[in-house]
A protein has these predicted regions:
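Short, small-residue-biased leader/transition segments that mark boundaries at the very start
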Residues: 1-2
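Short loop/turn motifs at secondary-structure boundaries
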Residues: 5-100
């Protein structure tokens, strides 16, 4: 008999806020903790109206809170993470806050 173990991947720990003020702490937003398990995962970041602001990779530096070089306001932003689990495409959605 052959038993296959299938690992389930969950995104439970992501930054709930970031503070892009140039102090070197929490200046960018990303879910880099999943990079070791999901290096090909990517993230779309949206404003409250659903406008796409940025696409980032989990292995990149993250989002700095700007759009076309302009700083965006302190508010909530939404994201969608696309990744693979057991060869199947999956999606995770949630939100975070930008605080200035």
């Amino acid at each position: 008999m052959l038993f296959r173990s299938q690992a389930t991947f969950r995104i439970v720990n992501y930054p709930k806020f970031f503070t892009p003020n140039g102090d070197g702490y929490n200046d960018t937003w990303n879910i880099s903790e999943i990079a070791s398990d999901q290096p090909e995962a990517y993230i779309y970041i949206f404003d409250r109206y659903g406008k796409l602001l940025k696409q980032i990779s989990v292995i990149g530096e993250g989002w700095d809170g700007t759009l076309n070089g302009l700083t965006l306001p302190s508010t909530d932003y939404w994201f969608r993470v696309f990744y693979k689990e057991n060869g199947e495409s999956k999606e995770f959605k949630s939100h975070f806050s930008l605080k200035r």
